[in-house]
Amino acid sequence: MAKLQAITLSGIGKNGDVTLNLNPRGVNPTNGVAALSEAGAVPALEKRVTISVSQPSRNRKNYKVQVKIQNPTSCTASGTCDPSVTRSAYADVTFSFTQYSTDEERALVRTELKALLADPMLIDAIDNLNPAYWTALLGDGSGPSPVPGPNPDPPLEPPPGTGSYTCPFRIWDLSSIYEAANSSHSWDIYNAVELSPRKFDVTLDDLLGNTDWRDWDGRLRYTTFRGSRGNGYIDLDATSLMQDEYLTSSKYLVREGKRPGAFGSIERFVYLKSINAYCSLSDITAYHSDGVVVGFWRDPSSGGAIPFDFSEFDSNKCPIQAVIVVPRL
């Protein structure tokens, strides 16, 4: 965090029409916490928005991001304010990583920081600023102008990918039967033949930061059940997919396969339609608990509610989009 850079967060607030320009305020040498604040024309309001980021070191593998918004309630049109008379809103999130910071991890921090700013308390603090603040800081006395609301009839499918993303796990073909169903198991076991890496028609940015996909229909928000990260996707829980019921049902295409060699293990694999191949559920769950099977909830009959019962998920209501590796929140 020694090389802090200015950050511009746009498209925030209830109507997505507020922009915050955050400038570095230095790093606390005691705890390594870096702070960025909004700089404005009014000195008393210069720290109206403060974002603190605790960078992981080799011995501390957590990010902690805290957003603090102080909304001045005592300001005049001339720009004089009493900074002690404020109401504040806070939100924070801690990330756990499996290794030292990477570009992808930093991208996730930026994405989830934006998701934090969608918190209702912070939206209220952003949108309901004292009018005198807008007069002093923006010079127009009115704050941001309103923009059209969300699409009342959003598309059922997520936006198409803007590029390609390589599957981070080994992929397999399970087309030939190794051992047919018998008295010991009621499902076929297949030969697992490893394939060359393949790409999804989607980029990592689409999964972590596509604002057209994020909260695409007003339902999938930062705090929604079952691992939705506010980006319009859901962690389908690779551990649950390994249960016997998924081998015998048609909810998701899960097969049991034997890896190559005399001592090759028998594992369970999930089919990834986007690349026409299978991925080992054991590989996903073993990756420091950071492997994620990505599904996209699209069941209109639910009225927008994501079910609490994982057994209600299937390939029609929540088709698999990809598998990725991201730090869990």
Curated annotation (Swiss-Prot):
- Pfam annotation, one family: Read-through
Matching SUPFAM superfamilies: RNA bacteriophage capsid protein
Xref: Gene3D superfamilies: MS2 Viral Coat Protein
Claim: DNA repair is one of the keywords in the record: no
Subcellular location, in the record's words? Virion
Q: Which domain of life is it from?
A: Viruses
GO molecular function terms attached to this record: structural molecule activity
| Main localisation | virion
* Span list, region Disordered: 143-162
Q: Per UniProt, which keywords does this protein have?
A: Capsid protein, RNA suppression of termination, Virion
Keyword tRNA-binding part of the UniProt annotation: no
Instruction: Give the Pro residues compositional bias ranges.
Output: 145-161
Q: Which GO terms describe its cellular component?
A: viral capsid
Q: Report the function annotation for this chain.
A: Minor capsid protein.
- What's the further remark here? This protein is translated as a fusion protein by episodic readthrough of the termination codon at the end of the capsid protein. Readthrough of the terminator codon occurs between the codons for Tyr-133 and Trp-134, thereby producing the readthrough extension.
In Swiss-Prot or TrEMBL terms, this protein is called: Minor capsid protein A1
